Amino acid sequence: CDSGMILAVKEDSEYADTIKSLTDCDGLKVAVKEGATSYNVAQSFLDENPDVSYEIVQYKDTVGCVSDLLAGRVDVVVNDLLNQKILSQEYEGTKIVCDPFTHAENAIAVQKGKDDLLAFINECIDDYYADGTYDALWTKWIDASGEGEEAASAAEDTAE
């Protein structure tokens, strides 16, 4: 499944309705995971946009980013969409404020030579796409539209 970098803020912060891109982070403290894609994206943006200036604050893990966001020590977090969705469930009070602005594909690693296993995994994935299971699971667990439970239930009824 695909993902990408997003921006998250504290739900009740003054930035909850104003930050939509890294350009909007001018003058703010931006949390990223040390050495990760979030750091590379935030730093590259600064390098390519000299008119924008924000302080990059690096953390050993994304939990530290979110913890300091909620504590008010940083203003915004750059994180992977899927990772942030999980963290937002565990640490209430954060809000994703934009769609992914990078593209990242996720994969399942299979040991070289395990062709039967690879074929089985690919067949399962194809089946999930074909019968609507993938879309229902995405909506139920990832999509924040608020209609996740209803869409997943409809897909289950169709599959039965």
Where are these regions (language model features)?
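Periplasmic-binding protein-like
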Residues: 1-11, 81, 85-126, 144-152
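Surface-exposed, polar/charged faces of alpha-helical domains
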Residues: 13, 20, 51-54, 71, ...
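Ligand-binding clefts/hinges and TM-proximal coupling segments of bilobed small-molecule sensing domains
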Residues: 37-57, 89-97, 125-160
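Beta->alpha turn/N-cap motifs
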Residues: 10-11, 33-36, 61-62, 77-85
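Alpha-helical elements of the RecA-like P-loop NTPase motor core of helicases
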Residues: 39-40, 66-67, 85-86, 119, ...
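Short helices/loops that flank or line small-molecule/ion binding pockets
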Residues: 20-24, 44-48, 57, 62-78, ...
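Flexible hinge/capping segments at coil-to-helix
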Residues: 9-29
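Short beta-strand->loop
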Residues: 25-35, 59, 111
